[in-house]
Amino acid sequence: MVNVMFSEKEIEYLKSQHIARIATAAVSPDGSVQPDVVPVGFDFDGEYFYVGGMNILKSRKYKNVLKNNKVAIVIDDLKSVDPWDPRGIRMYGTADIVTRQSGYMEQTPHPQADYIRIKPEKKWSWGIDEPVLLSTN
């Protein structure tokens, strides 16, 4: 397993964000594959991403991870619309299911201790260590 290293600015950015998009996929009984991407809340501890949810055990992402542990995750935003200045990090990784008592779902009206834990194995980032587009003014 590859140990992805994040720059200090990437870690600062990741810890400032609250929403990610996770993509999962699994083969259904009829042999078809339907990718699924959803916005999710997350925790990041510097090594792993933790994705929970009020009904995580019934979610498609949870069921997909049980069948196929390969996932993709994107965390992005816009620093500015004018000038256009996007930033973000895209990752491929492997996922498993863990129980943790101190995750972000503990603070919700419906605490849940089960999480999808994602170990990034490959990453791409843009606009974090330096601007994506520089102004021509």
Map each language-model feature to its residues:
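A structural signal for short, well-ordered beta-strand segments
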Residues: 42, 93-95, 120
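Short beta-strand segments
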Residues: 17-56
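Extreme N-terminal tail/first-helix region
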Residues: 1-20, 137
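Short hydrophobic-aromatic micro-motifs
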Residues: 49-52, 73, 116-118, 125
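C-terminal edge-of-domain segments
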Residues: 99-137
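Short, structured beta-strand-loop surface elements
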Residues: 32, 56-114
